């Protein structure tokens, strides 16, 4: 496996209904550089674990699964996957999220490579609430600006960067 320029950080716990779409959106990325997908599987009790290991078997040059022996919780899972990432850059896509743009990694990496004075890029996203079926479009509603409270971009209001 080539050293990746970008590591896609994905944590998951009981995301069986969503995990395939999350992984497929990463695998569909069109890039001119190598990237990896590092999945932190935290002892899911549904079929998530089997799904991520199946993908890892089918895409061994791209996907690495770091599986818990016992549930460690979201924070510890998040941190250990950061440490497992080997890329110069880290992109986040949680196991119940997905990207719409198949060139997301290429665009963001091109920007960072051509602007070494920047250390973070993010993109707007829609939030979908499964229980109500409601979507909040353009959650950040900013262009080329850091929101007033940039730490909330990282936290994603409880979700992580998208």
Task: Show where each model-derived region lies.
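Nucleotide-sugar donor-binding/catalytic module of glycosyltransferases
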Residues: 1-162
């Amino acid at each position: 496996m080539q050293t990746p320029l970008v590591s896609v950080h994905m944590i998951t716990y009981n995301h069986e209904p969503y995990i395939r779409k999350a992984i497929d959106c990463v695998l569909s990325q069109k890039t001119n550089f190598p990237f990896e997908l590092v999945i932190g599987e935290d002892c899911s009790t549904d079929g998530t674990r089997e799904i991520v290991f199946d993908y890892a078997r089918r895409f061994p040059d791209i996907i690495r699964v770091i599986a818990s022996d016992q549930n460690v919780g979201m924070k510890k899972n998040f941190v250990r996957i950061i440490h497992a990432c080997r890329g110069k850059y880290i992109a986040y896509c949680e196991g119940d999220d997905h990207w719409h743009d198949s060139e997301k990694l290429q665009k963001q990496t091109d920007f960072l490579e051509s602007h070494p004075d920047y250390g973070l890029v993010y993109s707007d996203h829609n939030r979908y609430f499964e229980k109500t079926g409601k979507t909040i479009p353009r959650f950040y509603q900013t262009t080329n600006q850091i929101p007033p409270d940039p730490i909330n971009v990282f936290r994603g209001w409880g979700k992580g960067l998208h």
